[in-house]
Swiss-Prot record:
Keyword field contains RNA-binding: yes
UniProt-recorded name of the protein: Large ribosomal subunit protein uL3
Gene: rplC
Protein purpose: One of the primary rRNA binding proteins, it binds directly near the 3'-end of the 23S rRNA, where it nucleates assembly of the 50S subunit.
Description of how the protein assembles with itself and partners: Part of the 50S ribosomal subunit. Forms a cluster with proteins L14 and L19.
PTM (free text): Methylated by PrmB.
UniProt record, GO biological process: translation
UniProt entry keywords in alphabetical sequence: Methylation, Ribonucleoprotein, Ribosomal protein, RNA-binding, rRNA-binding
Coiled-coil ranges (or none): none
Lineage: Bacteria, Pseudomonadati, Pseudomonadota, Alphaproteobacteria, Hyphomicrobiales
Length: 213
């Protein structure tokens, strides 16, 4: 099990494959993705690498993190994430990971924070059909309707689909295909949509369920 990477979402575009078909892709940019710390079985009880990406001003970095970056002899990073790895995949502190870490055609799992939509109704949030337009329905056309029974069970069950805060949640999209990479510019082109807004930090790992596809 090897390390993933931290990348920044640039936006979406499309490219053409060898058959002349256009493929929608999300462009991710890797900006100075370096190993800033390691975790070992002897010292921590597990093996992992801690990566940092982007650039942060020293004044905006906490004193503890400044110390960590100084020990690793790297510039302060805007985003830090830890990846569990097998013992033979541990990397030296200061090692930079580039876009060539992934190959075209490979499947990856992508993690990001979805765009927040604020408080949303049941129709927008869960795709409910709403109530009828006429025949006695007044004001409640977009409501979710009944939420439970009567005295038995006498409550609304947990996880009932209702109106509420939509988006801004941590989401992992599995088995997305890497269309191509550009190591010189640090770009990874992934087929389809990736959770998060433009400029958001994204975690990209090797797919864990790729054998099933």
């Amino acid at each position: 099990m090897r390390s993933g990477v931290i990348a920044q979402k640039v936006g979406m575009t499309r490219v053409y494959n060898d058959a002349g078909e256009h493929v929608p892709v999300t462009v991710l940019r890797m900006d100075g993705c370096q190993v800033v710390a390691t975790r070992t079985v002897e010292k921590n009880g597990y093996t992992a690498v801690q990566l940092g990406a982007g650039q942060a001003k020293v004044k905006n970095t906490s004193k503890a993190m400044r110390g960590n970056f100084a020990v690793a002899n790297v510039e302060p990073k805007a985003k830090v994430a830890e990846f569990r790895v097998s013992e033979d995949q541990l990397l030296e502190i200061g090692t930079e990971i580039k876009a060539g870490h992934f190959a075209a055609g490979q499947l990856v799992d992508v993690t990001g924070t979805t765009i927040g939509k604020g408080f949303a109704g049941a129709m927008k949030r869960h795709g409910f059909g709403g109530l009828r337009a006429t025949h006695g329905v007044s004001v409640s056309h977009r409501s979710h309707g009944s939420t439970g029974s009567r005295q038995d069970p006498g409550k609304v069950f947990k996880n009932k689909k209702m109106a509420g805060h939509m988006g801004q949640t941590r989401v992992t999209t599995q088995n997305l295909e890497v269309v191509s990479t550009d190591e010189d510019r640090g770009l990874i082109l992934i087929k389809g949509a990736v959770p998060g807004s433009k400029g958001a930090w994204i975690i990209v790992r090797d797919a864990v369920k790729s054998a099933a596809k």
